[in-house]
UniProtKB/Swiss-Prot annotation:
GO terms for cellular component: magnetosome membrane. Residues 298-314 are annotated as: Magnetite-interacting component (MIC), binds Fe(2+). Residues 263-270 are annotated as: GL repeat. Keywords: Biomineralization, Iron, Magnetosome, Membrane, Metal-binding, Transmembrane, Transmembrane helix. InterPro entries: Magnetosome_regulatory. Residues 289-314 are lumenal. Belongs to the magnetosome MamD/Mms5 family. Seen in gels as a band of about 7 kDa, suggesting it may undergo cleavage. Residues 1-267 are cytoplasmic. The lineage of its organism: Bacteria, Pseudomonadati, Pseudomonadota, Alphaproteobacteria, Rhodospirillales. This is Magnetosome protein MamD. GO terms for molecular function: metal ion binding. This bacteria makes up to 60 cubo-octahedral magnetosomes of about 45 nm in diameter which contain membrane-bound crystals of magnetite (Fe(3)O(4)). It comes from Magnetospirillum gryphiswaldense (strain DSM 6361 / JCM 21280 / NBRC 15271 / MSR-1). The isolated charged lumenal magnetite-interacting component (MIC, residues 298-314) binds Fe(2+).
Amino acid sequence: MQDLFLAKVESAMQASQVGALAGQTATVSSVSATTNLATITPTTAGQAPIIVKLDAARQVTELQALMGKTVLVGKTPTTIGGIGNWIALTPAAGAKTGAAVAGTGQLVMMKVEGTGAAIKLPALAGKSFIVAQPPVAAGTKAAGMLYLNPVGGGDMVAINIQNAMTQTGGLVGKTFTVAPSPVIGGTTGKFLVLKPMATGVGKAVGSGAVVAKFVPAAVTGTGGAAAIGAGSATTLMATGASTITPVTAAAAGSAMLTAKGVGLGLGLGLGAWGPFALGAIGLAGVVALYTWARRRHGAPDVSDDALLAAVGEE
């Protein structure tokens, strides 16, 4: 039996009436193949039945399989791109409690554009992603794409979404699990359904950035930082999408992590992490860090002028 039933209904009023029961149980009392009308009756005494009109014959058939059964009513899904009004029902057998359903976030639904995008959906179902900021060049507009970074690592997934440019910005930095796509007509679902995760690898902060986890380099017996090779499992930052080490980043042509930057880091006694320190705390901070390290090991101080002169020669 399916875990989640999503149905497109005739009007926003019908969707809101069903959504008002979120977290409660109800019974699918009747489903008519002639009129496409379905009756959903709350199990709580004193509440009136709700009648909705389903959009497609296929959904009538699917809901008929739940007739006479108890379902948990979910919140009205948030829809993007003018894709109509939807309701969410979950078969009660083996499902979460009503309180848990009421406490979860709303589903987010959007329609994909093109056969290629629709074909991707089944493979994404059940997997978790962090919505990424569109990689847009300066002076250009974002294409109608939604970018998803797999939680735990992997290649970024780009999906063509209807009206994605203007309505998906609020999703950036948030973590979702992809739910199975409802099929309205034909045999392929054309709707991307995102289910908010209660807890994720990252948490949205500020403008939607994902909190990065810092993993320090291993410390050697001499007090220095052990070199981390390109193939090491240890990473500087882990956002669920990519791994970065100072050497591999420099090899990739980063403006900050050039050979000069690596050489400067080695000269300051910071090893290959020197360029990252320069980018994070600036030259003045590196000077202070270098002075502290020398004092800790009993080495004589070096004047600021001498150190800055050495930097200028790099």
